[in-house]
Amino acid sequence: MNITPCSIKTLKGLYDISGVEVGQHFYWQIGGFQIHAQVLITSWFVITILLGSVIIAVRNPQTIPTDGQNFFEYVLEFIRDLSKTQIGEEYGPWVPFIGTMFLFIFVSNWSGALLPWKIIELPHGELAAPTNDINTTVALALLTSAAYFYAGLSKKGLSYFEKYIKPTPILLPINILEDFTKPLSLSFRLFGNILADELVVVVLVSLVPLVVPIPVMFLGLFTSGIQALIFATLAAAYIGESMEGHH
């Protein structure tokens, strides 16, 4: 049996692909707790970018807006329109929450697509986008669940729980199950899409470096933005649903 150098190279490439992993965690030990440090580091980085950009752009508001001020005013209008469409006339208090969710997820996703986190060497583990960790997406989903429970209870009081037996008490188990499936779908949709995008890029780079992965990276930027929009839209829709009491 003849094994050519080409076939050996092909087998080696396939072996390298088989070694692609989701990633290793970098931990901090604080007291008796083990903390995913890479999530905190990259999350702080994203938050610093957001706060720094806003402070620089709007610290001196101009009557004739600068380009940066125009951009952030456009982003604010977009978030307000999104909140009003999904929540209704009482959208005002929820604009900061929906905006925070959208901007944090958007910048986190783009940081994973644009920044070479992997080249930063750690004692163990590796850095990645915050939304590439299931802990982050679950936390965001649980915050959304807490928000729509608060919205419903603050408007309707204990009568909010009547929704579980409407239109018929037979649907009680299904209505309760729905409150568990909402955060699950939010968290796993975001985590799965971001993780899949990064893995596809890693595999393509290992096969054909530099040229072929570039269109996939641009596609990743597009889908990253779409995922942030989907999460924010669903969060606003759930809040509006809890306040209006319709399904």
From Swiss-Prot:
Broad class of the protein's primary localization: plastid
Record keyword Mitochondrion present: no
UniProt GO cellular component terms: chloroplast thylakoid membrane; plasma membrane; proton-transporting ATP synthase complex
Topological category with respect to the lipid bilayer: Multi-pass membrane protein
GO molecular-function term, one example from the UniProt record: proton-transporting ATP synthase activity, rotational mechanism
Keyword list, A-Z: ATP synthesis, CF(0), Chloroplast, Hydrogen ion transport, Ion transport, Membrane, Plastid, Thylakoid, Transmembrane, Transmembrane helix, Transport
InterPro entries linked: ATP_syn_F0_a_bact/chloroplast (IPR045082), ATP_synth_F0_asu (IPR000568), ATP_synth_F0_asu_AS (IPR023011), F0_ATP_A_sf (IPR035908)
Locations listed in the record: Plastid, Chloroplast thylakoid membrane
Pfam families xrefs: ATP-synt_A (PF00119)
PROSITE patterns given in the database record: ATPASE_A
Chain coiled-coil ranges: none
Chain segments annotated as transmembrane: 38-58, 95-115, 134-154, 199-219, 220-240
UniProt cross-references to NCBIfam families, sorted A to Z: ATP_synt_6_or_A
Function text: Key component of the proton channel; it plays a direct role in the translocation of protons across the membrane.
Stated family: Belongs to the ATPase A chain family.
Subunit structure: F-type ATPases have 2 components, CF(1) - the catalytic core - and CF(0) - the membrane proton channel. CF(1) has five subunits: alpha(3), beta(3), gamma(1), delta(1), epsilon(1). CF(0) has four main subunits: a, b, b' and c.
Name of the protein: ATP synthase subunit a, chloroplastic
